[in-house]
Design a protein with these regions (language model features):
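Bacterial N-terminal signal peptides that target proteins for export
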Residues: 1-10
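Short, functionally important structural connectors and interaction interfaces within domains
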Residues: 9-11, 15, 256
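Transmembrane beta-barrel domains of bacterial outer-membrane proteins
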Residues: 25-297
């Protein structure tokens, strides 16, 4: 597995992030900057040792109208015989629509990714991803739905189509949020995708917000799990592209976020992801730790 980390591997969608504002902006624009890093150790792999990634992201929102985000990442995948280095860039724009016929906000969003690396096979280099999404969040912020699509263009004629319907529900007086997302992924050539013609997976995330009485108590906690299989996936919430052809067979994660000031937060997360390389009949795990520091003004 090699993925490009982005906004945060454990955030909810941009719409549900509005449930807890990071800070009050002094003007019409609200700016948020993220610095993040990830380190993972592989277990059970005969070819991989570890992977690390660092990234920065800047997001700007104009009043309640919409906004944009720009980010970049650098990734190092340490094989037992070599090292792969990768650069990724990310851009996103969204527009909020307020229609009289709808009891909430309709959001149109477009993401783009470009990934380059020194893969000697050339199969994961110069990857382009286009990912539109339409979402709805009611005014009570207790119901969310979206439909996302991603088209990924790989070298050697491979393309990957992905459809991701999502449902989110708030409950317990807005202290809890449950989100479910289905991943339907279809590569154009099974021979370039571990002899897999399509994959289906269900991703679930539960978030609980606390009312911390001290800085040591988390502001919120996230628990996530992935069931089923997916390959060449594009994660819109995490702004991540899984651009090496191993089949992900599930994952589990735990994350906590602390509020360290009126406009600054720290998130720490850990998890385990399982993968299968069918070509060499090998199943292995990636155990990772993730840190995200964000500030807003």
């Amino acid at each position: 597995m090699l993925k490009k980390i982005g906004l945060s591997a454990f955030t909810l969608s941009l719409a549900t992030l509005g449930m807890i504002p990071l800070a009050q902006a002094s003007g019409d624009w609200k700016i948020q900057a993220d610095a993040q890093g990830m380190y993972a150790q592989y277990s059970g792999s005969s070819t991989r040792k570890n992977i690390s990634s660092e990234g920065v992201l800047l997001r700007a929102d104009y009043l309640d109208s919409g906004g944009f985000a720009l980010g970049t990442t650098a990734t190092q995948l340490q094989f037992k015989a070599s090292t792969l280095t990768q650069q990724g860039v990310y851009a996103s724009a969204n527009k909020h629509l307020y229609l009289d016929a709808l009891p909430g906000v309709l959001t149109l969003r477009m993401d783009g990714h470009y990934i380059s690396n020194n893969d000697v096979t050339g199969s994961s280099n110069r990857v382009k991803v286009y990912a539109p999404q339409v979402s709805f969040l009611n005014y009570r912020k207790s119901f969310y739905a979206d439909l996302g699509y991603a088209y990924s263009s790989y070298p050697k004629g491979l393309s990957v189509s992905q459809l991701t319907p999502t449902l989110g529900l708030g409950f317990n007086q807005a202290a809890d949020w449950l989100q479910m997302r289905v991943y339907w992924v279809k590569p154009s050539n099974a021979a370039q995708a571990q002899n897999t013609s399509s994959t289906t997976a269900l991703e679930s995330k539960w978030t609980h917000w606390f009312a911390p009485s001290s800085a040591w108590i988390p502001q919120k906690m996230d628990v996530g799990a992935l069931f089923g299989q997916r390959i060449y996936a594009v994660d819109g919430d995490a702004a991540a592209v899984y651009n090496i052809a191993d089949v992900q067979q599930g994952s589990i994660s735990l994350a906590s976020q602390w509020r360290i000031s009126e406009s600054a937060h720290v998130m720490l997360a850990a998890g385990n992801e399982r993968y299968r390389n069918k070509f060499i009949s090998e199943t292995y795990d990636s155990r990772y730790i993730y840190l995200d520091v964000k500030g807003a003004w």
